[in-house]
């Protein structure tokens, strides 16, 4: 018997004096784990979504609640886009940003909510692998785009209030179009990078996603291969797409509030504060829930808490945005009255 590297070689002599070498190799713990992972790995064709809750008695009430929210979201955002498109006096950079935000909110909600509603009324919440990756891709595109669109709108408000005489120069039609284009490009690039890294992830036999949609973190928890690069990408992009827009919005509103405080008329000051507070509330809910989900260490994160947090920035905020940004907007009210008046006259 000869010990060679990590194996043991046996010398066996047969009756015809022929010597055979039989070698048995021992695998290291790391090699053993890789071998077991390879054996357990299978090409995943579908996933099972756990949903918001597994309690059957809550499925119908939740279906009705989220159906109502989705209907309001669709009507509010498509109504805002239509109203701005039909009203010539709203064809300005400010309302171009608002129209783009409404489009993003509509798409953001539509990527997730219809599938979730179907899952409420079906016994098996199955989603195919291609469908899951497609949902994840477009979710990331519109979620990231919304982060930067809110920042662009805050900057637009800062220029309008703090530098009104230079507004038409700084926020020209060309600058507005360029900012909107950059917002979508950032969303497409970041989403493509995430999906590209997902192709290197190997999934084990476990195919149950503890979420109501194909969330990035929930999918990575099913991996039986290293997800270090994916997690590093999440950390970097979350910092860029959450912290940078948040700081932009915060600094913009600090200057806006400082300008509002210089307003002499109490009525004008109170209206401006009321408008800003509603905007800040919507932005805080969106970025706060997103940061809770993606900037929290995985060691202390809870998927149940993450699902509740996700509801706010994927479903609730897209419903609230058109209401918040138009509720105290006189131009929108005038445009709505004119549009409804024309329809009544016709």
UniProtKB/Swiss-Prot annotation:
Sugar-modified residues: 16, 40
Cysteines engaged in disulfide bonds, as pairs: 132-214
Pfam families, sorted: 7tm_4
InterPro entries membership: GPCR_Rhodpsn (IPR000276), GPCR_Rhodpsn_7TM (IPR017452), Olfact_rcpt (IPR000725)
Main location: membrane
Residue ranges of the TM segments: 61-81, 90-110, 135-155, 175-195, 233-252, 273-293, 307-327
Any one Gene Ontology cellular component term annotated for this protein: plasma membrane
Compartment list: Cell membrane
Keywords: Cell membrane, Disulfide bond, G-protein coupled receptor, Glycoprotein, Membrane, Olfaction, Receptor, Sensory transduction, Transducer, Transmembrane, Transmembrane helix
GO terms, biological process: G protein-coupled receptor signaling pathway; sensory perception of smell
SUPFAM superfamilies, per database record: Family A G protein-coupled receptor-like
All ranges on the Extracellular side of the membrane: 1-60, 111-134, 196-232, 294-306
Cytoplasmic-facing ranges: 82-89, 156-174, 253-272, 328-346
Source domain of life: Eukaryota
Record-level Gene Ontology MF annotations: G protein-coupled receptor activity; odorant binding; olfactory receptor activity
General function of this protein: Odorant receptor.
PANTHER family for this protein: OLFACTORY RECEPTOR
Similarity remark: Belongs to the G-protein coupled receptor 1 family.
Protein name: Olfactory receptor 8G5
Record organism: Homo sapiens (Human)
Originating gene: OR8G5
């Amino acid at each position: 018997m000869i010990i060679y590297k990590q194996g043991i070689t046996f010398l066996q002599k047969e009756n015809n004096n022929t010597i055979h070498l039989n070698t048995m190799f021992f695998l290291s713990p790391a090699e053993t784990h890789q071998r077991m992972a390879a054996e357990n790995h299978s090409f995943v064709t579908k996933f099972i979504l756990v949903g918001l809750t597994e309690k059957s008695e809550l499925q119908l009430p939740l279906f009705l609640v989220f159906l109502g929210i989705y209907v309001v979201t669709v009507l509010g955002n498509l109504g805002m886009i239509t109203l701005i498109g039909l009203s010539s006096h709203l064809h300005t950079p400010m309302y171009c940003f608002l129209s783009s935000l409404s489009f993003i909110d509509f798409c953001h909600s539509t990527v997730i909510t219809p599938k979730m509603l179907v899952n409420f009324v079906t016994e098996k919440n199955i989603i195919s692998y291609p469908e899951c990756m497609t949902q994840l891709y477009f979710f990331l595109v519109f979620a990231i785009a919304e982060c930067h669109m809110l920042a662009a709108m805050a900057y637009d408000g800062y220029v309008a209030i703090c530098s009104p005489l230079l507004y038409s120069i700084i926020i020209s039609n060309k600058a507005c179009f360029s900012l909107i284009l950059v917002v979508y490009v950032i969303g497409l690039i970041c989403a493509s990078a995430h999906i590209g890294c997902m192709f290197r992830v190997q999934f084990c036999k476990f195919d149950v996603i503890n979420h109501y949609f194909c969330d990035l973190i929930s999918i990575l928890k099913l991996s039986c291969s290293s997800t270090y690069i994916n997690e590093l990408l999440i950390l970097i992009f979350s910092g860029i797409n959450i912290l940078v827009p948040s700081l932009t919005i915060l600094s913009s509103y600090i200057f806006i509030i400082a300008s509002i405080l210089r307003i002499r008329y109490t009525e004008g000051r109170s209206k401006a504060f009321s408008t800003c507070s509603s905007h800040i509330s919507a932005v805080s809910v969106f970025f706060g829930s997103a940061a809770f989900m993606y900037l929290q260490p995985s060691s202390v994160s809870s998927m149940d808490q993450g699902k509740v947090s996700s509801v706010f920035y994927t479903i609730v905020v897209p419903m609230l945005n058109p209401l918040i940004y138009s509720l105290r907007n006189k131009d929108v009210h005038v445009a709505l009255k004119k549009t409804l008046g024309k329809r009544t006259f016709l």
